[in-house]
Amino acid sequence: MSSSSSSPFPQAMKNGEYRNWAELPPELTSSILLRLGAIEILQNAQRVCKSWRRVCQDPSMWRKIDIRIKENLVNSVELFYVIEPLCCRAVDLSQGGLLEINIDYLVNTSFLNYIADRSSNLRRLGVVDCAPVLSRGVVEAAMKLPLLEELDITYKSSIREQELKVVGQSCPNLRTLKLNCTGDVKCCDKVALAIAETMPGLRHLQLFRNGLSETGLNAILEGCPHLKNLGLHQCLNINIVGDIVK
């Protein structure tokens, strides 16, 4: 059956034909580009043609930003002198409309503050390998993000309870907290107590390799009465493992 002439999608190409990517409808181009990360768009996709560049400049393209860093670039000169400026450009293109950002490895105090200063409407912040800046960067950013609803942190060193308290006090709308430790774990309930004390609105909490005991667990269950899901994975000081659904 032949395709309808009113179809919004381009007809299939015949053998020997070539697609003119510049003639794709803007909504289809946008759908394609949204499957790429911020770096791929800014380094490559926006250079395909003028029409693609126009789509890439649209603030609606930058409501969600995924910054995926290749492992071989971690700690490289290119990461900080090429990639970081591109990521700042992505934040600028959102024109204050950024709602969600996920960052792999490219985490430092100045960049986190750059995001927070220009994205007061941010709802989700996800960072991987943020050990060098957890004490200042995440806390300083959180103080400028009162609408933040989800915080997802993967870190190597211990989190201080004072830092979590500031986050909880600065982000009253926080509903999801994920703390994933990839380093050494110490038996300690301070983090759990900080969560219980300052984050009563949590609905979803995930702790990976946390040193809390049953005392900390009970404090969380009492201090966060709206919890729907509590995921405890490799938390070796308690007997409950897996997801607790209330």
Curated annotation (Swiss-Prot):
Gene3D superfamilies: 1.20.1280.50, Ribonuclease Inhibitor. InterPro entries: F-box_dom, LRR_dom_sf. Pfam families: F-box-like. Residues 18-65 form the F-box domain. This is Putative F-box/LRR-repeat protein 9. It comes from Arabidopsis thaliana. The lineage of its organism: Eukaryota, Viridiplantae, Streptophyta, Embryophyta, Tracheophyta.
